[in-house]
């Protein structure tokens, strides 16, 4: 019953997306690209939540909050390094599926089905890619994209990490629902690991 209610919350929470043509009009738990994190967290909370990354490029700062919501286990945000306003360039909410990727796939398919109804006119596709942090190629991102003409996107991913990556970073398999600005997406695809 909780899963059904959580999916309904997710669906009703994103219905405004159907008429939006700008990624900043989309929200996850009321938060969106272009918002200041200061609208949701204190500066102390932000500074105390900065996390290291496996990215070689340090253009963006990552923070994570594990005070989940009714549906999500936690949130991750990226903003430009030294940005005193902490403007959100990317955000994602996640659910952990420790060593249980099959359940992640089931939840991903449920969310994709519902979101696809809302995004009828936006290019969407599924793609499995190797995770850049794992040079062995054993960690996979099973991604579903909704791409906007601006270059921004919405992603619904199941991240399936290898045992090596789990040991190195303590990353567990998870579902992520995320928003990325076009600028952040360009950085992620072309600069982040160079």
Language model region names:
Residues 20-62, 90-194:
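Non-cytosolic coordination micro-motifs
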Residues 64-87:
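Compositionally biased P/S/T/G-rich terminal and signal peptide-adjacent segments
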Residues 4-17:
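Sec-dependent N-terminal signal peptides
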Residues 11, 68, 82-84, 135-137, ...:
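Sterically constrained small-residue positions within well-ordered secondary structures
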């Amino acid at each position: 019953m909780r899963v059904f209610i959580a999916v309904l919350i997710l669906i009703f929470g994103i219905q405004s997306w159907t008429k939006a043509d700008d990624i900043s009009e989309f929200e996850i738990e009321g938060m969106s690209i272009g918002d200041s994190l200061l609208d949701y967290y204190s500066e102390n909370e932000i500074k105390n939540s900065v996390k290291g990354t496996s990215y070689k490029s340090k253009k963006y700062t990552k923070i994570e909050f594990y005070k989940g919501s009714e549906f999500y286990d936690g949130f991750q945000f990226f903003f430009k390094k030294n940005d005193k306003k902490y403007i959100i360039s990317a955000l994602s909410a996640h659910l952990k599926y420790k060593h249980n990727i099959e359940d992640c796939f089931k939840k991903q398919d449920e969310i994709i089905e519902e979101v696809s109804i809302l995004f009828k006119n936006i290019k969407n596709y599924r793609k499995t890619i190797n995770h850049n942090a794992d040079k062995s190629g054993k960690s996979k991102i099973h991604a579903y994209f909704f791409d906007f003409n601006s270059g921004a996107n919405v992603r619904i991913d199941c991240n399936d990490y290898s045992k090596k990556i789990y040991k190195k970073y303590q990353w567990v398999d998870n579902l992520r629902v995320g928003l990325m600005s076009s600028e952040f997406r360009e950085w992620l695809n072309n600069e982040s690991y160079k």
